From Swiss-Prot:
Transmembrane segments: 5-25, 31-51, 75-95
Name assigned to this protein: Uncharacterized protein YwkF
Primary site of residence: membrane
The UniProt record lists the keyword Metal-binding: no
Encoding gene per record: ywkF
Localization per record: Cell membrane
Pfam families listed in its UniProt record: DUF5316
Topology in membrane: Multi-pass membrane protein
This protein's GO CC annotations: plasma membrane
Keyword terms, alphabetized: Cell membrane, Membrane, Transmembrane, Transmembrane helix
């Protein structure tokens, strides 16, 4: 999780640079918001939360325990990487 958090912090540094380079074209809210939505969306997709109950049951029975664990770790890493962008998005909206 430390690597995912570090990647998230690097991502907000890159997002801040993009916002500084293109101040008229992109707002900080848009940059942080889009990055947050993309990372949370990837976490939802990789975790399997966006499937129906019957699909989830079929995936559970056809998937190995190691595969399920690695998929959940990947989803958690995407979500942890999204946390800094979400916090920056909230800070730009509130202040």
């Amino acid at each position: 999780m430390k690597k995912a958090l570090t990647a998230g912090i690097l991502l907000i540094a890159i997002e801040s640079m993009i916002g500084t380079i293109f101040p008229q074209a992109l707002s900080y809210e848009a940059i942080f918001g889009v990055a947050s939505l993309v990372l949370v969306g990837l976490a939802i997709i990789t975790s399997g939360l966006a499937v129906s109950g019957s699909d989830q049951r079929a995936n559970y029975h056809s998937e190995t325990k190691e595969g399920r664990t690695s998929r959940m770790k990947m989803a958690a890493a995407f979500f942890v990487a999204a946390i800094p962008s979400i916090l920056c998005y909230l800070l730009t909206i509130l202040f």
